[in-house]
Amino acid sequence: VNKNALDTAWVEAQLRDARWHTSSLSSGGTNCVQVAFLERGVVALRDSKNLDKPPHLFTDAEYDAFIGGIERGELRRPER
């Protein structure tokens, strides 16, 4: 899927009807990253404290690479 070529109306409809997931490790706080799995292999990520901002859209492959990087520790903050 070419996420840059997606129809805006389709994306808006998908986001309006999206089922957003929050990690069980977030303790129900308001500083959470939320994910929604849309049709056509599109994944949306948003910040629960900034719901007025549009979410970031990823392909399934991009999302899998992102999660893989987290799991491998590749996205840790560098030592200061």
Language model segments and positions:
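A short, structured beta-strand/loop element
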Residues: 23-68, 80
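N-terminal first-folded block
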Residues: 1-32
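Post-signal peptide N-terminal regions of Sec-secreted extracellular proteins
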Residues: 7-10, 15-18, 48, 52-54, ...
